[in-house]
Amino acid sequence: MATILKGAPVVAAMNERNAALCEQLKAKGITPTLAVVRVGEREDDLSYERGVMTRCGKVGVAVKQFVLPADATQEQLLRVLDEVNTDDGIHGCLLFRPLPKQFDDRTVRAALRPEKDIDGITDGSLAGVFTNTDLGYAPCTAQACLEILKYYNVPLSGKRAVVVGRSLVVGKPAAMMLDRENATVTLCNSR
């Protein structure tokens, strides 16, 4: 019989844990701060940004917004990312993608330091996932899958796991993270 693993209790537990961590940091004079970097006014980005602001507010993370117009240049965006990288008061960065066509996605991603890349989009963050090192962060969806399994105490060691899709943002990182937990992983794709 199948067991449904609901996300809501996982989110509630993580929010409680993160709020406590934020309070501990604030007691030491550190205000956890997230940079949100957005180019343009796409409605889906705006909606996602509102959700980010709400979630950060619930756990005590400050948000610093960097908004560029849709016709911004790559140089302008790279300057913003340099500011984020060098500001010790900013602890993480969420760069909204996809970027408008005038941007070279690879160059922009490479400009963000992995230790501030909370979305796991930089090559450095992915290298951390694939080499099992503490460089950067795992992509959020892949990390969420593992968090859900851990919350429900799903044993992974020695088990067979199937991952549908092999994208760099979900499938491959999820497969590597499951492999790290000693699961035998099969990747499935449409080919």
Mark where each language-model region is.
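Short beta-strand elements in bilobed, periplasmic/extracellular small-molecule ligand-binding domains
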Residues: 56-70, 184-188
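Short beta-strand segments enriched in small/hydrophobic residues
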Residues: 31-40
